[in-house]
Amino acid sequence: MSYNADEDQIKDKLEQLRCHFTWELIIEETEIPDLENRVWEQITFLDTNYKVGIHNLLAYVKHLKGQNEEALKSLQEAEDLTQPEHANQSEVRSMVTWGNYAWLHYHMGHQAEAQIYLDKVKNICRKLTNSSSYRMECPQMDCEEGWALLKCGGKNYERAKVCFEKALEVDPENPEFSTGYAIVVYRLDGFNKAPESSGEFCLNTLKQAVRLNPNNAYIKALLGLKLQDVDQEAEGEKYIEEALTSASSKTYVYRYAAKFYRRKGVLDEALRLSKLALKETPSSAFLHHQTGLCYKSQIIEIKKVTNCQPKGQDKENINRIVPLAIQHFEQAVQLKPTFEFAYTSLAEMYAEAGDHKKAEDTFQKVLCMKSVDKEMLQHIHFHYGRFLEFHKKSEVDAISHYLKAIKIENASIDKNKSINSLMKLASKKLRRNASDIESLSILGFIHKVKGEINEALEYYEQALRLAPDLETSVPVTPRH
């Protein structure tokens, strides 16, 4: 048999494996440094019995960077941990590591070594399922795939959720499966959070995970945040305090506790915890963004107290805090160039500092990003609209972006905020000019979106009386 035929045969076997090379993990090239950093943080600071999968993911990341020898070392570490962590399932848990070994050796041109690991996988499949294939369907493998997808970012979360659901169907009381499922449901709930969402399902999955993992401080901290989301802040704080007293996953607990106290308005404590976490993980984009948000909240608080007219010491405090917020937001986007939320926060702070050019450039950069999900697009258009309305004093352009946020078919807080901002702006224009056809049409459109058909018709009819040939089935697009 020719070399090419041998290679094709091995490739066919490799593609049957269940491992990081076949799970179609969605990782953009610009995200690799941040992903590698997060994996290192988890290896160093996350107290878990499931580090085999983390070392496997690190090996895959090393391969993506072209560092195959380093990847082999990470796989060796995963192999060394398999027996201590999974004594009762070491053979099944080894299949992912062996699959990664096989793929890695194949990419390095080591066909004989690749075949050795393929044979290892095949032997386990034959032993446990009487199958001669190179893959096995079992909840442990579904769980391994779920963890890999979960750790690779938001574009993989829906598939991760399906994997953990499959695993839980077989073993609903499994602590590891429950933990993975609770985390991915929490993340997805955060992405898709609409104002009318109760978060009850997410809350129940977290409570189940805490019940099955009573010593897991990480999960307790997430439960505390979710309780805060659903207006049970006092109950949530109990879990946060409990997590803070634990020695487990301290750095991660600091992160989430800081977020909790920032949202509660206890900004000094939030900053203290953020700085403690940053001391351990200075390359965390998430932490830099959270720290920047603490400073931003301080600015909002000063403006609130001074009725948006800070003077004297208050003005000096804002001038001191704004550069600190900018510094952390800049660091966040530098560490994670696809961090859309941080770009929006950074643009707002540039505007606060009076640097409209940098603010405009930053908004344009994030608007031009590929594969931005609906919720984030609404967030960007709303905040860009605010910048255009209040900093650039461009009502026409602001209206355009509020409309873009509203037209996206997705219920979200930022969509509601855009509706309210657009209604205020159109009403203000109408008070200046009662015959403003554009504002009448926009108000008609807003009431239509809100399901208030009678009110919508009233505004459309007023607009038609002023311009009989006006098309009212869609909102008037602002003229540029």
Identify the residue ranges that each predicted region occupies.
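Helix-turn-helix repeat elements of alpha-solenoid scaffolds
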Residues: 22-38, 64-82, 110-127, 153-161, ...
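N-terminal alpha-helical scaffolding segments that mark the starts
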Residues: 1-56, 477-479
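Residue at a conserved register position within TPR or TPR-like alpha-solenoid repeats
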Residues: 62, 105, 149-150, 185, ...
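Flexible helix-coil transition and linker loops at the boundaries of alpha-helical arrays
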Residues: 40-47, 81-92, 124-138, 177, ...
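TPR alpha-solenoid repeat register
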Residues: 54, 97, 131, 177, ...
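"A position-specific structural signal for the A-helix of alpha-solenoid helical repeats
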Residues: 15, 50, 56-57, 64, ...
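Solenoidal tandem-repeat scaffolds enriched in leucines and small polar residues
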Residues: 124, 128-247
